[in-house]
Each structure stands twice: as structure tokens, then as C-alpha cells.
């Protein structure tokens, strides 16, 4: 599996409240958030592409490349100019470094979750699906605050719609929310659908 992790944003909310390093480098439970993200997958079996803000990579105080490679030595580090255009833009800017033939997961850089990666892989290969979005619903501690995520509409476990930051109904706890992991059958399929999002101005 090819794991693509966009981490080229600013993290403005965290900087405003006093954090001195980019969000993926904030230490939680003894290690940087980005290490928790890597732990969701298999360092031995997967390939990793980290799409980084060039200013973060060039800042010697952050040691971003060292932090990533100390935990994931085979990581491919891609540097792109800083932007506020989101992860789809970051991935499309980095396509020269991403395999088009491999099954691909795009994963956000600032969370972890409890899941069975092996069960997830077994399901996607068994169903031969073109894409998959791990999702959850019901009460979770983060729902105590107004932190909206990407919400899904589905019918018989097939996604029919998805939208960011806004639930489809007033009862958001009963809607599926994306955890931030997006699987595509191939890098080509990911690229094509990301381009469609841009062309249709869905971002």
C-alpha cells in the first residue's frame, strides 16, 4: 500500500494558541503526532510519501525531515511551497513522486484512531472496491465541542455524498463522519478524482 500524507498546511489555530512547531510535530503521549499517524499503517510493508511545507523543512529548529525519517527511514519527503488550498491541492502538486499503479491511501497528518488496518485491507481487497472511507458515528468526546468533520451520506455502505465541516442534518451524532483516511484502488484513480474535484470547484 502507498500511504500519502499531506502535511503542508499552516496549522494557524495551533500557532495562535502558542504552539511553536507545526501540528504534526507536536508531542502527544511521548511522541510527535506524525509518529502516531505512521503507526496506523505498516512501516515494513507500506511505502510512505510525506508532502511537506518547504518552509517547515527549511526551518532548522523543526528538524522535520529528521523527525519523520527517524521513525520511517524509507519515507519519501516531498517539498512544496506553503499554501492554504488543502490536501487535494498538495497531492496534485506532488504527483511526480506518487505511484500511479499502487493502491493508495491519503491520510491526514494530525490524528490517529483505533482500528484494525489488517481488517481494513482484507475488506477492500475482498470487495474489490474502487475506494473506501473509514467512518464512525455516535457520541465521541470531540463532539462535545463544535469541531465538525467531513460527513457522509450512504446507502447500504456505499457513499452517495460527502461534505466538509457541516453535517447533513441537525443530528450529527447519527451521521457517519470520516476519520481522515481515504483509500483509492490506484494512484491513477486518486489523481483523476482529485482533478475532477478541482475542475468542478468542489474545494
Regions found by a protein language model. Name each.
Residues 109-112:
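The conserved acidic donor/metal-binding loop of glycosyltransferases
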Residues 1-8, 13-15, 19, 27, ...:
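Conserved N-terminal catalytic core of the sugar/cofactor nucleotidyltransferase
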Residues 12-15, 23, 160, 182:
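Flexible, active-site-adjacent loop/turn segments at secondary-structure boundaries
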Residues 105-107, 132-133:
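A structural signal for short, well-ordered beta-strand segments and their strand-loop junctions
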Residues 24, 74-76, 158-161:
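Conserved beta-strand segments of alpha/beta enzyme cores
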Residues 114-197:
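Conserved core of the sugar-phosphate nucleotidyltransferase
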Residues 199-203:
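Short, charged, surface-exposed loops that flank catalytic or proteolytic processing sites
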Residues 21-24, 66-67, 121-125:
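Glycine-rich, phosphate-binding/catalytic loops in enzymes
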